[in-house]
Curated annotation (Swiss-Prot):
InterPro entries: P-loop_NTPase, Thymidine_kinase, Thymidine_kinase_CS. The gene is TK. Gene3D superfamilies: 3.30.60.20, P-loop containing nucleotide triphosphate hydrolases. The lineage of its organism: Viruses, Varidnaviria, Bamfordvirae, Nucleocytoviricota, Pokkesviricetes. Disulfide bonds: none annotated. The active site is at E85. It comes from Myxoma virus (strain Lausanne). This is Thymidine kinase. Its EC number is 2.7.1.21. It catalyses: thymidine + ATP = dTMP + ADP + H(+). Zn(2+) binds at C140, C143, C172, C175. It is an enzyme of class 2 (transferase).
Amino acid sequence: MAMYGGQIHLIIGPMFAGKSTELIRLVKRYQIARYKCLVVKYEKDARYGNGVRTHDNTCISAVPTASLDDVESISEHVEVIGIDEGQFFPNIVSFCERMANAGKVLIVAALDGTFQRKPFTNICELIPLAENVTKLNAVCMYCYKDASFSKRLGNETEIEIIGGSDKYKSVCRKCYFF
């Protein structure tokens, strides 16, 4: 296993910040450069079929899975691995470290915090292992300033509720408390 050349690129931020768009852009750039790429998406997010699709309908083919262990064998045959909705994979830290140490480039798009502004611990643990961390902001859907947080609409308290603008709004600090 190669111990050099691999890297982890982490893209974090709230809902609607463009994390999946940036993931797709980076993977497509590697594809143009003729790298073998694999994109993985969270299996329970079935809103857009078998691809990773942005809120503005940009799409890339992806393998749906509930566990990154399930894609480890096909990961051996690629050089770049894109992971969307990284916060939903409990073993993302060990998987990314293993793959990067094997010489692979990992591009992970993930929420950094819950709708309660609590950290996704697995993503926070990935930060010191990443060569590059990009924190994106969205636009506050109430006052149109920079938005760093995701606010859930409705009264559900579970952390994992898949949805788009029907379930969440991106908000700034001030509007989070409205």
